[in-house]
């Protein structure tokens, strides 16, 4: 089951209708949720990402905003989703971002957080371009602290490995640059090293070479 299917299954099983996509990027998750019949509001601090998302998903509502200061009233949403976005929030603001997501939930709502672990083939090949070890660990520590403080609770997190088809080093660089265009220049400077790491870590999947990335999903409800 892919990540998007996991999220939509959770939302639909919970009877969610109004969903906030926090850190939406170019709108990939928003597009999927709209197709599934959900009412989607999405935020991202990058105006260019929001502009691209609005063009791609005209049936969702998009706002330029940071996760640490959501411009919504309490009780506005049935669910909030951080899909690979919490670790992009500045570390000192991660806890506030989680509190904000809990604040805007309706009674019975939940916050879904999906984060990549600081391990695995995809991560190892990416490290010369951007080593996210510390920020990924900080995101998980923020979630753990929230639960330890008795602010939120939820079932044990789910962990799985996501395969990403990447035909070659060039395709891998393209994949990284789609998330952050600034990565391309760094990746090009590290092309020889990336090619070596790609050869060491890529495995053959049903559609050609792929790199796997372990992911973890939390479901958090306010206490």
Per-segment meaning from a language model:
Residues 20, 25-69:
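Class I SAM-dependent methyltransferase SAM/SAH-binding core
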Residues 95-107:
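A short glycine-rich, Lys/Arg-flanked "PGG" loop and its adjoining helix->strand segment in the class I
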Residues 1-17:
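Conserved alpha-helix/loop element of class I SAM-dependent methyltransferases that forms part
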Residues 84-85:
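Short catalytic micro-motifs in class I SAM-dependent methyltransferases
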Residues 112-137:
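Conserved class I S-adenosyl-L-methionine
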Residues 81:
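A conserved beta-strand element that flanks and buttresses the S-adenosyl-L-methionine
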Residues 136-150:
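Short alpha-helix
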Residues 150-223:
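Conserved Class I S-adenosyl-L-methionine
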């Amino acid at each position: 089951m892919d990540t998007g299917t996991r999220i939509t299954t959770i939302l639909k099983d919970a009877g969610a209708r109004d969903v906030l996509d926090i850190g939406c990027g170019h709108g990939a998750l928003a597009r999927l949720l709209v197709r599934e019949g959900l009412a989607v509001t999405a935020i991202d601090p990058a105006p260019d990402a929001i502009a691209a998302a609005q063009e791609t998903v005209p049936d969702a509502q998009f706002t330029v905003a940071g996760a640490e200061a959501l411009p919504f009233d309490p009780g506005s949403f049935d669910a909030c989703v951080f899909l690979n976005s919490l670790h992009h929030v500045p570390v000192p603001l991660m806890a506030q971002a989680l509190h904000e997501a809990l604040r805007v939930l309706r009674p019975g709502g939940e916050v879904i957080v999906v984060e990549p672990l600081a391990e695995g083939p995809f991560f190892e090949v990416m490290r010369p371009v951007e080593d996210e070890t510390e920020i990924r660990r900080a995101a998980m520590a923020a979630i753990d602290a929230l639960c330890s403080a008795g602010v939120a609770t939820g079932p044990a997190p789910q962990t799985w490995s996501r395969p990403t088809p990447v035909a070659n080093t060039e395709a891998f660089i393209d994949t990284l640059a789609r998330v952050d265009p600034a990565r391309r220049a760094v990746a090009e400077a590290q092309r020889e090293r990336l090619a070596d790491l790609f050869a060491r870590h890529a495995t053959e999947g049903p559609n050609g070479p792929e790199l796997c990335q372990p992911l973890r999903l939390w479901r958090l409800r306010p206490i």
